[in-house]
Amino acid sequence: MTNIRKTHPLIKIVNSSFIDLPTPSNISAWWNFGSLLGLCLIIQIVTGLFLAMHYTSDTMTAFSSVTHICRDVNYGWLIRYMHANGASMFFICLFLHVGRGLYYGSYTYFETWNIGVILLFAVMATAFMGYVLPWGQMSFWGATVITNLLSAIPYIGTTLVEWIWGGFSVDKATLTRFFAFHFILPFIIAALAMVHLLFLHETGSNNPSGLISDSDKIPFHPYFSIKDILGFLILIMLFMTLVLFTPDLLGDLDNYTPANPLNTPPHIKPEWYFLFAYAILRSIPNKLGGVLALVFSILILMLFPILHMAKQRSMMFRPLSQCIFWILVADLFTLTWIGGQPVEYPFIIMGQMASILYFTIILIIFPSISLLENKLLKW
């Protein structure tokens, strides 16, 4: 008799995705982040659901409803801090996952890569709208500043901003719709993640060498299911350490002050995971130029498959490209740091230099170095 997991219409989908999936035998721990992102998404949906049961999306009661969750709801403080820090863990895993894709040339799977970039945009939109919900000072002013950027769009800008706000400023209508979108988007992300996996399983996983590994595949279960569970345990340990010991380490203390439209905080800045893009936005004196640079700083990821000039897929055997890759990583750390600094000398010029370097590395240096390496290898 054939095993039910191979014949049942539903179970065989799970079987071909997580049990009998042929997987390259040499994939390293860098391939763990896909499953870790799945875990982060599940944590966020579950904790978010319980928070939504007690949260009210009204400007008068939003802040106090979050206080009520932390003070009066059973383990409400834990759920709230797990949700807030879960976003940080999500982005740490996302950045490492994207970095892995860049380093090992996974972007040559066009569909998988492009859906991944769309997923990144969706997660960023969800995180931004979630940050507005507690209705603290940084929530209100962050929402005001970021939505206001759309007014830079010629002709329709102002109308578009007022349409998103549902009025002439960030107010009750804005908060209500942001809550609605923040609730629905994670389910859209989950659906997109399934499409992401579908396209990945069409081609099979990449591996550190970047070579075709059809001759050396092993079943996903038990080898990589065990490896993923180890990743889960490490992530949960680090995550719960952060939540239980320093829950406000990555947050902004200004958000413990209720939103006040009459009092602007001295330094308006987003959460740490948006700071690199925020630094690029601030580096350009022109409003429209800044917005375009901000969008393009993420959208540029879609150009990687086109800009790939190397004869080899992975950077594993390309030391010059490796060097440039780590310079890019250092540049992103610099941009993140500058995004959190006040707009004054020397941070302005440093931010501009780091922004120029970011785009130059991706658009010019990477393809040039790849062509040089081809020449050195006489290819």
Curated annotation (Swiss-Prot):
Note whether Transcription regulation occurs among the keywords.
no
Report a single Gene Ontology molecular function: ubiquinol-cytochrome-c reductase activity
Chain positions recorded as a ubiquinone binding sites: 201
Q: What does the cofactor field's note say? A: Binds 2 heme b groups non-covalently.
Query: Where are the bilayer-spanning segments?
Result: 33-53, 77-98, 113-133, 178-198, 226-246, 288-308, 320-340, 347-367
Describe the family membership recorded for this protein in Swiss-Prot or TrEMBL: Belongs to the cytochrome b family.
Kindly give any further remark recorded in the entry. Heme 1 (or BL or b562) is low-potential and absorbs at about 562 nm, and heme 2 (or BH or b566) is high-potential and absorbs at about 566 nm.
This protein is called Cytochrome b
